[in-house]
């Protein structure tokens, strides 16, 4: 990269995005997230693999959703909208509320009661969004907001909004720009299924323009209790500790299937136990704290290595979609509890076992 300050994904990749010179860019300087080598993760699974972690939790609101939201909000402002609406398992609501605040728009978000991590809910609230907790699932909330957007002067900013995926594809551009090539495999958690579709779109556009010579195989991971694509059926009551991917009827289901099939990839499932084990492993082996949905990718890596699905010497990129601070409760439940000690040197040394 040059010494010029990072301008946000729209300005950085303007040539690849549906914007004009008159589009009012609403940005929090999202993007430019680190691609972190993970040698200890490789050592713990298959030492011949080159593993990199695309840490999207370092975006302004702590998740990959910011990439799509800068586009969705910018285009909403361009169209004259004064309000936006979304359904969310948490991260979309946080991003929508923040970017709407940045643009001076009203934001309305609907979340399933009891299914949104505290960190995400607090973000939407502090940014001034009107938050409604629905007595139902995410899929029911999405159906409601879609109907509202069809009949009222408010812009829908879920991933069914085509500008969302346009923004999210920039993560694939960054992977190539940082790695110097496309990976052999790209592993990603799948909830509403927009992100795996967006990455594939980005890789294909770079390939079309000769910026990469090969394309990765896209591998998606769903939680076992919320795996509609894997099971090829709508899950009426999805269940998983990974609330960000607790979705039973993904809006981008068809696009995700195309991405997987066209890239010769596949979709697999991981259990909550595997997710939480990988969640702790990622934090303790690589020093990276990401939310449980992100750990689905690491759990999938472990499972697929054991199954022999990756050729030795392959390069893998794993997308970690959101920061661990999004869901502090799960972290505290999964970690070693703090120990109380008297304020004395001997008591402290007795606990440290040095």
Predicted regions and their residues:
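PLP-dependent amino-acid enzyme catalytic core
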Residues: 1-354
């Amino acid at each position: 990269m040059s010494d010029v300050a990072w301008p946000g994904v729209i300005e950085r990749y303007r040539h690849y995005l549906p914007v004009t010179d008159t589009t009012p860019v609403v940005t929090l300087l999202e993007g430019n997230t680190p691609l972190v080598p993970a040698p200890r993760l490789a050592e713990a699974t298959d030492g011949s693999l080159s593993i990199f972690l695309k840490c999207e939790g370092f975006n302004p609101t702590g998740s990959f959703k910011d990439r799509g939201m800068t586009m969705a909000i910018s285009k909403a402002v361009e169209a004259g909208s004064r309000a936006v609406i979304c359904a969310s398992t948490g991260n979309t609501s946080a991003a929508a509320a923040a970017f709407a605040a940045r643009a001076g728009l009203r934001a309305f978000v609907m979340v399933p009661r009891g299914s949104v991590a505290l960190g995400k809910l607090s973000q939407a609230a502090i940014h001034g969004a009107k938050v409604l907790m629905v007595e139902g699932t995410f899929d029911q909330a999405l159906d409601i907001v879609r109907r509202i957007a069809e009949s009222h002067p408010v812009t829908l900013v879920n991933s069914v909004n085509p500008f969302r995926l346009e923004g999210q594809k920039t993560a694939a551009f960054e992977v190539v720009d940082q790695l110097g090539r496309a990976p052999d495999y790209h592993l990603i958690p799948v909830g509403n299924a927009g992100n795996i579709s967006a990455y594939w779109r980005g890789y294909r556009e770079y390939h079309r323009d000769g910026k990469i010579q090969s394309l990765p195989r896209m591998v998606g991971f769903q939680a076992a209790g919320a795996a509609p694509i894997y099971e090829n059926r709508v899950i009426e009551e999805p269940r998983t500790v990974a609330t960000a991917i607790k979705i039973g009827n993904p809006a981008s289901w068809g696009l995700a299937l195309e991405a997987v099939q066209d890239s010769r990839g596949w979709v697999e499932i991981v259990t909550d136990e595997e997710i939480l084990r990988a969640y702790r492993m990622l934090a303790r082996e690589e020093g990276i704290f990401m939310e449980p949905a992100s750990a689905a990718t690491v759990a999938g890596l472990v499972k697929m290595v054991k199954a022999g699905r990756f050729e030795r010497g392959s390069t893998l990129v794993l997308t970690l979609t959101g920061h661990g601070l999004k869901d502090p409760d799960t972290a505290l439940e999964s970690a070693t509890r703090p120990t109380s000690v008297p304020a004395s040197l001997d008591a402290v040394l007795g606990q440290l076992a040095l």
